[in-house]
Amino acid sequence: MAGTMPLRPTYVGFVRDTTDALLIFEACLSGTLSHVPRRPHDRERQDLIKSGNIFVYEEHASGIKRWTDSISWSPSRILGNYLLYRELEKPFPPGEKKRARGRNGKSTTQSGGISKARQRNTVPFPQGLEHGNEYPSVPSDDERHLVGSLVDSYDFKEQGLVKKTISITYQGVPHHLVSYYNVEDVKAGLLSGPSDDPRLRGVVPRTELMNGQNFRAPVEEAMGGSYMPSMVASIGYPTLQHQSQMHQSQMHQPQMHQPQMHQSQMHQSQMHQPQMHQPQAHQPQVHQPQVHPPQVHQPQAHQPQYQSQTLHPTHGYQQTYAGQPNAPSSTWW
């Protein structure tokens, strides 16, 4: 029955980081979004394998062991918790090992996942565009977040697709996400992420999805697998609002440190502050002469000294003696 129903992508947009993928996985587990029941048929691939389409399938229920889409892809490269593939201009010849191009345009042989160059070029690698690759040989940071290290190692198709995959295990069952996008579509802001989708605003990944996975990088540190729209603002592309990135930006914004002056430093600062000398106005001292109260001379009343008078015993008149003032010159008797 599932094979007769038309196949639709689980989601249309762009998964920037691990958190975006976990939102889609959680939405599928909770019934907000739907797993795809099968792989696309050959007649459906042209309409389904295109930029923006994201497919999530559960390995046991769908019976899908390997996702196929009839596109020639480069070998995978790790970017955060994702695997990246880029569309090739033409497939590798049958039976030939996949060989990466060296910087001088020569091919290299892969053995055990390690590439060894056949020839090394001593001439500095040109900064121009490689044949079949629209990206410069030294990519910018925003291109690294979209194509990883798949820059000029193979003969990539111009305006080709990038495939981005990630897997989780929930209750012992593997779930896989396969995303397709065109680099220019992401740069132009044509593909929004699940964090911007109002339908998924209330979706919160369950604890088993956040902590129970064997991710290469912790979820909060897996920004190496994301594309930061703010990185392309300087080259004129519109940016997207990403709620989780905005939240992390607020959390990691540098705080302006206000140095607090230590008490001893404050004391020293107070000690070393120049003191403004305020001249004290000289107050003239007014000499107050001490007023000596006039001493009032109190004349002492002269007490007349009375001389004892001796009356003459016979006559009764005053008797004087010679030598005393007013003494008579002679005696009368």
From Swiss-Prot:
Q: Where is this region: Disordered?
A: 93-139, 241-307
Q: What keywords sit in the KW lines?
A: Activator, Nucleus, Transcription, Transcription regulation
> What triggers or suppresses the expression of this protein?
Regulates its own expression in a negative feedback loop.
What does this protein do, in the record's words?
Global transcriptional regulator that acts as an activator of secondary metabolism. Required for expression of a yet uncharacterized secondary metabolism gene cluster containing a non-canonical non-ribosomal peptide synthetase. Not required for conidiogenesis nor for pathogenicity, but is involved in vegetative growth.
Instruction: Tell me which species this is from.
Output: Gibberella fujikuroi (strain CBS 195.34 / IMI 58289 / NRRL A-6831) (Bakanae and foot rot disease fungus)
Highest taxon listed in the record's lineage: Eukaryota
Q: Where in the cell is it found?
A: Nucleus
Q: Name one GO molecular function term.
A: DNA binding
Q: What is the name of this protein?
A: Global transcription regulator sge1
Question: What family name appears in the similarity comment?
Answer: Belongs to the MIT1/WOR1 family.
Q: Which GO terms describe its cellular component?
A: nucleus
